[in-house]
């Protein structure tokens, strides 16, 4: 009887390990980004620049990315872009099979930001999701802010020209609420 119980527990354990990654694909990635109602007045959705971001589309132009995305377990992603006469706001989210994938993506983006040599942006930690960073510089219409963070198996980011830091953090928190509701 004891060996039967071990087999049963082993089968259950295998099922649970397989079930969590399989469920990652069941999240609608469109639910992970900002919607029109979330963004400041005057910003309009650019339908041509918005939509699902498959691994294939994300890998174009960088031969390293297909292998990295596969290794990280990226399932899919989604991006919305909103345009305004004074700027652009982009909301994106990448869905992974597990939290390790979102952690690896975050580390990659932070490393790329360090090595890219972008001058004039200040990096500040933010308490959104499991933690993240705000890269910001400039003011008024010339302001550029990028917020990146992760939550469970989601890596998320917001980038904007012409949107001030405090407003960006509010938008990131709104997107985080959408993410938390979608990946429960």
Kindly give the residue locations of the regions a language model identified.
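Short, compositionally biased low-complexity segments enriched in polar/charged residues
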Residues: 41-90, 94-96, 100
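Short, well-ordered beta-strand elements
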Residues: 90-92, 149, 153-162
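Short, surface-exposed beta-strand/loop micro-motifs that present aromatic residues
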Residues: 76-83, 143-151
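Surface-exposed amphipathic alpha-helical segments
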Residues: 157-184
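Sec/Tat signal peptide C-region and signal peptidase I cleavage site
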Residues: 20-24
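Bacterial N-terminal signal peptides
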Residues: 8-18
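Bacterial N-terminal signal peptides that target proteins for export
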Residues: 1-9
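Short Gly/Thr-rich strand-loop-strand
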Residues: 46-61, 67-68, 100-147, 174, ...
């Amino acid at each position: 009887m004891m060996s039967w119980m071990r087999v049963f527990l082993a089968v259950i354990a295998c099922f649970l390990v397989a079930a969590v990654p399989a469920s990652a694909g069941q999240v609608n990635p469109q639910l992970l980004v900002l919607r029109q109602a979330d963004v400041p007045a005057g910003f309009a959705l650019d339908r041509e620049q918005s939509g699902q971001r498959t691994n294939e589309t994300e890998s174009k132009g960088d031969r390293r990315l297909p292998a990295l995305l596969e290794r990280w377990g990226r399932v899919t992603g989604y991006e919305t872009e909103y345009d305004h006469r004074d700027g652009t706001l982009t909301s994106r989210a990448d869905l992974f099979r597990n939290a390790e994938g979102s952690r690896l993506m975050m580390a990659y983006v932070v490393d790329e930001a360090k090595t890219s040599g972008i001058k004039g942006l200040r990096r500040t930690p933010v308490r959104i999701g499991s933690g993240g960073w705000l890269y910001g510089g400039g003011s008024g219409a010339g302001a550029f802010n990028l917020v990146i963070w992760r939550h469970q198996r989601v890596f998320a980011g917001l980038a904007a020209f012409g949107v001030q830091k405090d407003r960006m953090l509010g938008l990131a928190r709104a997107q985080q609420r959408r993410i938390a509701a979608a990946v429960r």
